[in-house]
Amino acid sequence: MVRISIPTLPKAPLVPPSGLSVLPIPQAAAHLASFLEKGKGKTVMLTGAGVSVDSGIRAYRGEKGTYSNPNYKPILFHELVEDSDRGDMFRRRYWARSFLGYPPVRDAQPNPTHIYIAALQHLGLAPKLITQNVDNLHRKAYSLLSPSYKESNILELHGTLAKVHCLKHRHEQKRDSYQEEIARMNPVWDEEAKEAERTGRRPRTNPDGDVELHGVDYRSFSVPPCRICEQEKVDPSMVKPNVVFFGETITPRVRDESLNLIAEASSLLILGTSLATYSAFRLVKSAIELNKPVLMITTGPTRADPFVEKGMEKMDRVAGDVLGKYLDEAVKTSTGQEVEDVKRYLHTGVVKRPPEVEGPRAEG
């Protein structure tokens, strides 16, 4: 039996804070300006859960790099797809919890950091973005600045919760349609979801849209099969969200595309992530091996900290603060429609902290 564990990080930073971490914000923003200028519009950005905390979506890890919810036990990929009575119960448990957990993620709005990142793309300073997040917030932010934005400029490394597909035939549909099907088949759960929305007393939601429920019997919960399979009169297949589960690997297409983006980039800007997952860490490792300049702006220890000895620069601070100051200065001396678009939305965005998050903005 293969043992699969949730990626963890050291309890303490592997390297002491650098001089970049203690620079006043204006000087930190000036350093970012120099980094992007040298990138000449070919800098690629890599983001993680930390950038979505201010949108009310809890990060996996806190400011010290420790797992924020050590008692949380997500469904692993092999459990979800197991063809047995046990697997059937895992699917009931996953979809019941995700049915309640998806609406807060679906309804979340971009925060200022998402707007800043979209601005860097829209201005052509760092047009390509790789994100580990599955919350769709980067796309929402970019579409505000540019309704005709290129979807190909954002690569979702771990997929998106906004879509689902069946495993046997790869029939894809919007998540909202599947949510409606779940609600129709589970009226009691649907009423619970509506009550939670009315009162605001939603259970704790994790970044993958799963929630914590205790003492619940999932046997009465019905998981809809793929309706497209039924319409096409083929064997119905189980449905999963378009996200990479723990224990599942990213597709070869996404892996190759992400590595190609790094190979073609002039530099790599990392924002709000501890890089605990190998699929993201591998990209930084590749950039270092290719001698690309790398700047990381995030809080707490990360898996990539040893790369500081190989030339990676790290600012141990909240990314949004630096990005916002940099863009304030950048748009002062620039002109054009893109600049006007950015000015219109620059300091907008909704800040809605997760109810149980206190202190500094965690960037996991």
Per-region residue spans from a language model:
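Conserved catalytic core of sirtuin-type NAD+-dependent deacylases
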Residues: M1-G364
